[in-house]
């Protein structure tokens, strides 16, 4: 009987531990994305790597809205960079800088 109670207490303790690590992992993912953006310095290759973290965040219900909004911003920025390579460099660069600043300000 004592063993059964001890096992039940240990099992409930493990469940509590397992539940408390999930929010920590979620916040770590968001922190990882922010760190990725802050170190990307506008590099298209690095931003593409950040996109993979966003894809994981999209799967988490509590971060889905944030991830969707950031995905749009990142795609806008990537399209902006492509436009600078193919055409009106100076006019588009100002727009790119604006989009990049939005991304950075959301990840401080």
UniProtKB/Swiss-Prot annotation:
Its main location: membrane. Induction: In the absence of chitobiose, expression of chiPQ is silenced by the MicM small regulatory RNA (sRNA), which sequesters the ribosome binding site of the chiPQ mRNA by an antisense mechanism. In the presence of chitosugars, the chbBCARFG chitobiose operon is induced and acts as an RNA trap to degrade the constitutively expressed MicM, leading to the translation of chiPQ. Pfam families: YbfN. The keyword Cell membrane applies. It is found in: Cell membrane. A lipid is attached at residue 17 (N-palmitoyl cysteine). It comes from the Bacteria. It is a lipid-anchor. Transmembrane segments: none annotated. Keywords: Cell membrane, Lipoprotein, Membrane, Palmitate, Signal. A lipid is attached at residue 17 (S-diacylglycerol cysteine). GO terms for cellular component: plasma membrane. Residues 1-16 form the signal peptide. InterPro entries: YbfN-like (IPR025727). This is Uncharacterized lipoprotein ChiQ. The gene is chiQ.
């Amino acid at each position: 009987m004592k063993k059964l109670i001890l096992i039940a207490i240990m099992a409930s303790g493990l469940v509590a531990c397992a539940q408390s690590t999930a929010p920590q992992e979620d916040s770590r993912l968001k922190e990882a994305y922010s760190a990725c953006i802050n170190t990307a310095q506008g590099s298209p290759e690095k931003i593409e790597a950040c996109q993979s973290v966003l894809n994981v965040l999209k799967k988490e219900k509590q971060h889905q809205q944030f991830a969707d909004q950031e995905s749009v911003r990142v795609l806008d920025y990537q399209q902006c960079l492509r436009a600078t390579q193919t055409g009106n460099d100076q006019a588009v660069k100002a727009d790119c800088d604006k989009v990049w600043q939005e991304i950075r300000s959301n990840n401080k």
